[in-house]
């Protein structure tokens, strides 16, 4: 029986060490590898390099890839701006301020389906907003439910910065079918739309909220031009930001009221 490999123990007398040396078909007596000049063995079991190259997929040529690429007809394809434009917005927030106060709130117009829903949300948001109205908040809420004359006048700023009474534009942006028209008096404010979707197109859309209380006869005068806060149970007008007290008195005198206030029904 012929052995192809044998283990020979060599002794190095100079260093006094023993070490094994494997000899076989690929080794000669001097310990040199006869297969060093042949192809390199790869993996286990040993596979010739050229055989392994046959199983490796050839990388695609760059020219072939360029030929397969087709230009996109959609301009701006892949850009972040174009993706944001195609993505529908789920919210539409506008800033709401109580007249005379820097602190504001925001409300989502898309969370409401009608002006009535939005009007109720705004009234609940700003009711008792002032610290002096917190104590009587529950009583005032009850009076509002019973049909009190307490109302809110809502305006918005157009593109030119002018404050406009809302309600001319229907909720869905199309021609109004309900036949509503802007009311001349503050008493009818609750009967008309409160916030127009056109506010959202204004760069700095602001809704100014003015509170009207029972003691007033300024409905037709104040509705479109003057934003005032009428103190309930008191005989004076606290005008906010726009007109001085003297201007209001002159305006009342020109209307024949002689500057006096007549308590509403």
From Swiss-Prot:
Highly expressed in flowers. Expressed in roots and seedlings. Keywords: Auxin signaling pathway, Nucleus, Repressor, Transcription, Transcription regulation. The keyword Iron-sulfur does not apply. The keyword Nucleus applies. Residues 65-88 have a biased composition (Basic and acidic residues). It is found in: Nucleus. SUPFAM superfamilies: CAD & PB1 domains. Induction: By auxin. GO terms for cellular component: nucleus. It comes from the Eukaryota. Pfam families: AUX_IAA (PF02309). Its main location: nucleus. InterPro entries: AUX/IAA_dom, AUX_IAA, PB1-like. Lacks the EAR-like motif (domain I) which is one of the conserved features of the Aux/IAA family. Homodimers and heterodimers. Aux/IAA proteins are short-lived transcriptional factors that function as repressors of early auxin response genes at low auxin concentrations. This is Auxin-responsive protein IAA22. The gene is IAA22.
């Amino acid at each position: 029986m012929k052995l192809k490999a044998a283990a020979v123990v060599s002794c190095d007398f100079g260093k006094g060490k023993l070490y094994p040396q494997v000899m076989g078909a690929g080794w000669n007596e001097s310990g040199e590898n006869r297969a060093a000049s042949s192809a390199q063995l790869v993996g286990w079991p040993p596979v010739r390099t050229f055989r392994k190259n046959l199983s490796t997929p050839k990388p695609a040529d760059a020219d072939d890839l360029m030929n397969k690429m087709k230009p996109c007809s959609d301009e701006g394809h892949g850009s972040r701006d174009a993706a944001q434009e195609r993505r529908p917005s789920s919210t539409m927030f506008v800033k709401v301020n109580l007249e005379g106060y820097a602190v504001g709130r925001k409300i989502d117009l898309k969370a409401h389906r009608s002006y009535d829903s939005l009007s109720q949300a705004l009234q609940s948001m700003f009711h008792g907003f002032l610290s002096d109205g917190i104590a009587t908040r529950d009583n005032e809420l009850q009076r509002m439910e019973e049909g009190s004359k307490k109302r809110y006048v809502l305006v918005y700023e157009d593109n030119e910065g002018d404050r406009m009474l809302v309600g001319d534009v229907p909720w869905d942006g199309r021609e109004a079918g309900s036949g509503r028209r802007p009311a001349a008096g503050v008493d009818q404010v609750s009967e008309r739309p409160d916030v127009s979707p056109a506010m959202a197109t204004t760069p700095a859309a602001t809704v100014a909220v003015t509170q009207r209380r029972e003691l007033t006869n300024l409905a037709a005068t104040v509705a479109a031009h003057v934003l005032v806060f009428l103190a309930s149970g008191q005989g004076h007008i606290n005008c906010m930001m726009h007109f001085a007290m003297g201007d209001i008195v002159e305006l009342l005198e020109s209307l024949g009221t002689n500057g006096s206030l007549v308590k509403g029904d």
